[in-house]
Amino acid sequence: MKYLNKIQSVFIGGKKFFVLLLLLMAIFMSIAIADYIIPPDDPVYPFLEATQSLGYTEKLTSVYPQYHDEIINELTHMLSLDVAVSYKKLAEYHLKRLSLDSSDGFESALYPIKKIPQSFISIFTNHSHKNRLITYNNNNFSVFLSGIIGLDYDILKSDTDDKHRLLKYYGLEFGGNISENIGLFSVFRKGHYAGDAYFTRADSVQLISDNWENPEKVEIETECFLQTNLLNFSIGYGNFQLGKGITSSIILNKDISPFPYIKVSKQFGDFSYLSLYSQLVPDSLKNETEYESKSYALQMLSYQTDKLALTIGECSIYGDRNFDISYSTPLIMYKLVDFANQSRDNVNAFIMASYMPFKGVMVYNNLFIDDIKLSRLTTNKYLSGFAEQLGVSYSFEKIPLNITFEGTAVGPRTYCHRRDLTYSHRDQLLGYPNGSNQLNLAIQAHYLLPGLEFKVLYSNMQQGSISNDPFKPQPNTEFLAGEISRKQNIVTSIHYNFTPELQFHLRYEYENKDDKVKSFLYSGIELKY
């Protein structure tokens, strides 16, 4: 009874608790068809982004990852249009690669035993349908299981360094619809590094072991998805990207350590609503220190058509407690008022917009508002607490080539906050990764073929020495104040799927920061069967 009273107190009274129970019962009685996510690093996303500016997709989107059925519907819609042969071949390739079409019952690449040689040979022969270790299909129960083995070898060269690291890993991928209303996706990779210890620790985004002699790398992404006629619910462990961009998102970027989350979403016509709650890891966490709670809640409302996508949202990082239902509903807007009254919470707002003025051209804009005061907007410190990202993308109609220009300005003091509530997770910024008080100009060329992705990116960043570290208390100042440091990057990457099961990647990165030059070569091979 005491436990029930505690639950009721969260909703401020038994009547509200009873109403919530009725709402949950109504939700679970209005079941729809399930679905599951496609990971944000899947090669289908660059293809969909390139075709959005050509009007080949039904809706523009700027939230990743997306769901399997949504992507299949977009690819199917594209094949119904009069598009260039090169784009049609790419759509067919991804449609076959992502399809779950299989015969009813149980299938395995290892059973019967005599099938093993044929399964092994198929890894190296040309085909478009993706083979899997195990598949099972029976009415609404349709799942797959694939094993993963891989090898990465990376090199760092500079005037003073010549380092390398080797990663051998294995894993599993599981997904599908396990009932009429529940979808599931999970991928797991685990490996051990060898090579230079300091170069290895530079990949600390995924490292979980403090053993310098044998550091482990673990990658986990999973989500269980429940779709109903009222609301869609997800519980998972992973990360997201909000907003288009060729460098990184200024709102929420996907290149950070994953985190646990609960997500509620709903599509109604051209509008959609998304609520996200997550438990973050505090910065500079050590085994001997107390684990202080750090939570993240986000709300956003989107309007999407085939030519325009507009999203307004707000998010909050708070401590001192874990799940708080007031942060997981639109009531979070009242926290903006609390902030004006010296609340501890780190409350932010954001806007994302994409517009296709004419065929082939996409203009996108992302705005992140960390702190705003009307009196400061009329001074030379007006950019303090703001981050702005503007890009123009052009896709050629006859060949799958996309060129994008992008400018990103992150104002002084953006992302920082008092009382250890920096806009961060495990010492990594949730927003733009290079800190604040910076201007970054970039251009990218992206070329696609079935099974092949080629990308060249050039970026030029200038950063002021004042108010550029969000992990420390920062004063308001003018944009690019202090001594200017410059950093140029050239990144060339190739991802090649020899077959749908066997893929290679090669990336070369040249970095020149204040005339100090470094070069990186990242290479790898992965078999997923």
Language-model features: where?
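Bacterial N-terminal signal peptides
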Residues: V19-M29
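N-terminal cofactor/phosphate-binding cores enriched in small/glycine residues
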Residues: L48
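Short, low-complexity, charge-dense intrinsically disordered segments
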Residues: Y3-G13
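Exposed, low-structure sequence patches enriched in small/polar residues
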Residues: K217, A309-S316, R321-Y529
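Boundary at the C-terminal end of the N-terminal hydrophobic targeting segment
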Residues: I31-A34
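Outer-membrane beta-barrel channel domains
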Residues: P39-D42, L54-S62, Y67-D69, E74-A309, ...
